[in-house]
């Protein structure tokens, strides 16, 4: 079973963070727009169970993603199942229709501009995202995807990189939660 080990931090100065990442040998990509359409479950409250179901549009690619509840009190570590939706916009629309037919209802769309980098750190390749989230703010995310038996060392690795980048004030709420709080 695969888990996403993630830490997210508010970022007042993305340019300064990009410079720190460059100093670590990481090249930051150009901006890419991402739109996440989140769904509510017909029989349980995802806000209470700390789960999420979304369809992400990233350029001409689409993904269906389920995120399970966070499993600790300090990071955003959780089970993640992500499926690519081949067939572009038509397939994403078909999945949206299927989910609606099953009783799932759209909750909100999260719009962001994301730049990515990968940092080699403690023998791992950590994915770093610099995010500008519409109506929410700017953030940096550090992420590893690992098997269950590797969770503790992965969390320590991500925390170590966060310390090296002088990041503080971790944010455990999702962009959806932050957006809905501002609505």
Where are these regions (language model features)?
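Charged surface patches that recognize polyanionic ligands
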Residues: 16-18, 22-31, 45-49, 54-118, ...
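Helix N-cap motif at beta-to-alpha junctions
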Residues: 10-15, 87-90, 147-151
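Mixed-charge, glycine-accented linear interaction segment located at domain edges/termini
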Residues: 147-174
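A structural feature that tracks compact, well-ordered secondary-structure segments
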Residues: 8, 52-56, 65-69, 128-133, ...
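Charged, well-structured binding/catalytic surfaces in domain cores that contact anionic ligands
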Residues: 116-136
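Extreme N-terminal starter segment of soluble prokaryotic enzymes
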Residues: 2-5
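Short proline/glycine- and acidic-rich turn/helix-capping motifs at secondary-structure junctions
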Residues: 35-42, 114-117, 172-183
């Amino acid at each position: 079973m695969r888990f996403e080990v993630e830490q997210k931090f508010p970022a007042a100065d993305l340019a300064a963070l990009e410079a720190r990442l460059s100093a670590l040998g990481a090249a930051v990509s150009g901006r890419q727009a991402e739109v996440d359409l989140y769904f509510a479950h017909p029989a349980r409250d995802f806000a209470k169970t700390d789960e999420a179901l979304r369809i992400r549009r990233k350029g001409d690619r689409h993904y269906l993603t389920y995120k399970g509840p966070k499993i600790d009190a300090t990071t955003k570590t959780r089970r993640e199942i992500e499926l690519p939706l081949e067939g572009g916009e038509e397939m994403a629309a078909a999945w949206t229709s299927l989910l609606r037919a099953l009783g799932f209802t759209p909750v909100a769309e999260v719009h962001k501009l994301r730049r990515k980098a990968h940092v080699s750190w403690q023998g791992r390749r950590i994915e770093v995202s610099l995010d500008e989230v519409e109506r929410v703010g700017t953030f940096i995310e550090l992420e590893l995807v690992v098997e269950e038996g590797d969770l503790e060392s992965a969390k320590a690795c991500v925390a170590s990189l966060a310390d090296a980048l002088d990041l503080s004030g971790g944010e455990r709420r999702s962009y959806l939660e932050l957006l809905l709080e501002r609505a």
